[in-house]
Amino acid sequence: MALSTEQKKSILAEYGLHETDTGSPEAQVALLSARINQLTEHLKFHKHDHHSRRGLLLLVGRRKGLLKYLADNNVDRYRDLIARLGLRR
């Protein structure tokens, strides 16, 4: 259920600021969004998996905090990221 190494590398290559970037808010939010999407699909089939649901809520909270940080510090990067990820319709 976790992201494979290849999936992580492709996400980091697309959203990271440079090739080995793993710490920028954009890279972290992109990885969290991929994990959130995976867990959301899992929960569509396993509705009573409450442990995974709690994990999903923790990931959403972590992503929300990183997005808040990015919005407070650099609005242009924030708007670009949410547009690229398709968040906030």
From Swiss-Prot:
- Its Gene Ontology molecular function terms? rRNA binding; structural constituent of ribosome
Q: Which SUPFAM superfamilies match?
A: S15/NS1 RNA-binding domain (SSF47060)
**Family matches, as Pfam families:** Ribosomal_S15 (PF00312)
The answer to keyword Magnesium applying to this record is no
Q: Which domain of life is it from?
A: Bacteria
Asked whether the keyword rRNA-binding is assigned, the reply is yes
**Which sequence ranges are marked TM in the entry?**
none
Q: Sorted alphabetically, which keywords does the UniProt record give?
A: Ribonucleoprotein, Ribosomal protein, RNA-binding, rRNA-binding
What CDD domains does UniProt report for this protein, alphabetically?
Ribosomal_S15p_S13e
Q: InterPro entries from the xrefs?
A: Ribosomal_uS15, Ribosomal_uS15_bac-type, uS15_NS1_RNA-bd_sf
Single biological process term from Gene Ontology:
translation
GO CC, any one term: cytosolic small ribosomal subunit
Assembly: Part of the 30S ribosomal subunit. Forms a bridge to the 50S subunit in the 70S ribosome, contacting the 23S rRNA.
- Identify the NCBIfam families for this entry: S15_bact
| Described function | One of the primary rRNA binding proteins, it binds directly to 16S rRNA where it helps nucleate assembly of the platform of the 30S subunit by binding and bridging several RNA helices of the 16S rRNA. Forms an intersubunit bridge (bridge B4) with the 23S rRNA of the 50S subunit in the ribosome.
PANTHER family xref list: RIBOSOMAL PROTEIN S15, BACTERIAL AND ORGANELLAR, SMALL RIBOSOMAL SUBUNIT PROTEIN US15M
Instruction: Write out the similarity annotation.
Output: Belongs to the universal ribosomal protein uS15 family.
Return the protein name: Small ribosomal subunit protein uS15
